[in-house]
Curated annotation (Swiss-Prot):
HAMAP family: Rel_fac_1. Keywords: Cytoplasm, Methylation, Protein biosynthesis. One of its GO terms (cellular component) is cytoplasm. GO terms for molecular function: translation release factor activity, codon specific. It comes from Gloeothece citriformis (strain PCC 7424). The gene is prfA. This is Peptide chain release factor 1. SUPFAM superfamilies: Release factor (SSF75620).
Length: 370
């Protein structure tokens, strides 16, 4: 590798890791649980990079030793063959380790560790689009469960023929945003709808938005910009349903965003949930503007998360899911059951390749050490 800037960065990461390890051993930190958790999390985030760097250093030393044996083998053909084979194998290992280190050193998305609000809206296609939105709610719920994440439906607008006009899922767990951020965009389905008597294939769409959860400090909302009304809810609440107005209809005047929350048991809880969703929506709008600005400089094949970008087609007749960003096909049946990990990892890998290519073309990567 070893580009000079990468080696300097690795040494810096190693030094930070050692300092965090030293701090964890300090008895004083045990009296501050929040600080202990923060330091432990920071150290854990560097551990794979440091371990890989140590393996890379060890492999470099082994290559030097194997080359020395090859040099000293002289006329011993068997020894020369063994040493040459070892050098070849070690050089392959070294290349793999270098590629892994470059990926590990890519700048992390500050939102990657966050929980998300996943919004699904029925698009073109009438009743069938709403049914399709319901299928996507099920797909993402199944996938989240396979990742041991916690899923909760926090807002819904039911459609007459089944499914949803709109639904919002709250998904909590380990690195949720890092995996689901590439799911944002238009999901198109081609199939014979249950409402179609003639057996003709229809095309419908649903739009997915991925919104990192944010707190009040990250997104501040002026109370004067909010209009709130209440209504009787048909959600949880038993005999209170027809007596108490627990549902909350929140309207944000500057953006025109409207949120209707009925899933919680009290009006206060529904109001808090509506505000939480609004903060996530406003943050996602700001995030999209930033990503589109970056995208104008670097056209990402994986996509910017634009709501209007058609990212995937689900074809029932051919049992095929086509991801248009990857140019690859996957099994439809598996995907609809939530088995989309291979698609997600392919998107992550493509994004990493693009960012590595961009890094390689950057002027600051020019100096090289041997």
């Amino acid at each position: 590798m070893a580009e000079a800037y990468l080696l300097e960065k690795l040494k810096s990461v190693e030094q930070t890791y050692k300092e965090l390890t030293r701090r964890l051993a300090d008895p004083d930190i045990a009296t501050n649980p929040d600080e202990l958790q923060r330091v432990a999390k920071a150290r854990s985030s560097l551990e794979e990079t440091v371990n890989t760097y140590e393996t890379w250093q060890k492999t470099k030393e082994e290559i030097t030793g194997a080359r020395q044996i090859l040099k000293e083998a002289g006329g011993d053909s068997e020894m020369r063959e063994m040493a040459a084979l070892e050098v070849e194998e070690l050089e392959e290992q070294l290349e793999q380790l270098e590629n892994k280190l470059k990926v590990l050193l890519l700048p992390r998305d500050p939102n990657d560790d966050k929980n998300i609000m996943l919004e699904i809206r029925a698009g073109t296609g009438g009743d069938e689009a709403s049914i399709w939105a319901g299928d996507l709610v099920r797909m993402y719920s199944r996938y989240a469960e396979s990742q041991n994440w916690v899923v909760k439906l926090v807002s819904e607008s039911l459609a007459d023929m089944g499914g949803f006009k709109e639904a919002i899922l709250e998904i909590k767990g380990d690195q949720v945003y890092s995996k689901l951020k590439f799911e944002a965009g238009v999901h198109r389905v081609q199939r014979v709808p249950v409402t179609e008597a003639g057996g003709r294939v229809h095309t419908s769409t649903a739009t997915v938005a991925i919104m990192p959860e944010v707190d009040e400090v990250e997104v501040q909302i002026d109370p004067k910009d909010i209009e709130v009304s209440t209504a009787r809810s048909g959600g949880a609440g038993g005999q209170n349903v027809n007596k108490v107005e627990t549902a909350v209809d929140l309207f944000h005047k500057p953006t025109g965003i409207r949120i209707f929350c009925t899933e919680e048991r009290s009006q206060l809880q529904n109001r808090e949930r509506a505000m939480q969703i609004l903060r996530a929506k406003l943050y996602e709008m700001k995030l999209r503007e930033q990503q589109e600005a970056v995208s104008s400089m670097r056209r990402s094949q994986v996509g910017t998360g634009s709501r209007s970008e058609k990212i995937r087609t689900y074809n029932y007749k051919d049992n095929r899911v086509t991801d248009h960003r990857l140019g690859q096909n996957f099994s439809l049946v598996g995907a609809l059951e939530g088995d989309i990990e291979v698609i997600i990892q392919s998107c992550i890998g493509k994004d990493q390749q693009e960012r590595l290519a961009e890094l390689a073309n950057s002027p600051e990567t020019a100096p090289v050490l041997n």
